[in-house]
Amino acid sequence: MNIKRNKPNILITGTPGTGKTSLAGVIASNNEMNHIDISSAVKEKELHDGWDSEFQCYILDEDKVCDEFEDVMVKGGNVVDHHGCEWFPERWFDLVIVLRTDIKILNDRLEKRNYNQHKITNNLDCEIMQVILDEARNSYKQEIVVELPSTTLEDNENNQNFISQWIQNWYEKNN
């Protein structure tokens, strides 16, 4: 099913601590789009199957999340952020951004969040093994998946500029 939208949908994904939520919020605000923070929505709207005490997070119910956001996503104009990406419907997104962060910086960010050592190690391993990038490449058309560095403030500014320019190009092609 190919649905014509007036605004694009963008997924910003990456290992926890790569700056997804911050970047998604800025992009949504600067481009008059909606920011959908999946992790917050899972908690607030009870889109989960309980609590995972080992990883200290809710166990996301993918079907509940998809049902909750289907109508919103069909309309377009959304910037979604989440550390997982392979379970979203492919039709939802026009651009998939995978943020990557230097391991030392990522470790520092996760420690500041007071993550336990098991959770930090698991997330660092995911970043080293590029798990999220591989999931994105295996789940979406190659031409919509873009890997961006997210280690420095300059990276963040460059990413904002890249995505904003991409949005402008999308409007020119689609409206």
Curated annotation (Swiss-Prot):
It is found in: Cytoplasm; Nucleus. It comes from the Eukaryota. The lineage of its organism: Eukaryota, Amoebozoa, Evosea, Eumycetozoa, Dictyostelia. This is Adenylate kinase isoenzyme 6 homolog. One of its GO terms (cellular component) is cytoplasm. GO terms for biological process: maturation of SSU-rRNA; response to oxidative stress. Its EC number is 2.7.4.3. GO terms for molecular function: adenylate kinase activity; ATP binding; ATP hydrolysis activity. Broad-specificity nucleoside monophosphate (NMP) kinase that catalyzes the reversible transfer of the terminal phosphate group between nucleoside triphosphates and monophosphates. Also has ATPase activity. Involved in the late cytoplasmic maturation steps of the 40S ribosomal particles, specifically 18S rRNA maturation. While NMP activity is not required for ribosome maturation, ATPase activity is. Associates transiently with small ribosomal subunit protein uS11. ATP hydrolysis breaks the interaction with uS11. Monomer and homodimer. Interacts with small ribosomal subunit protein uS11. Not a structural component of 43S pre-ribosomes, but transiently interacts with them by binding to uS11. HAMAP family: Adenylate_kinase_AK6.
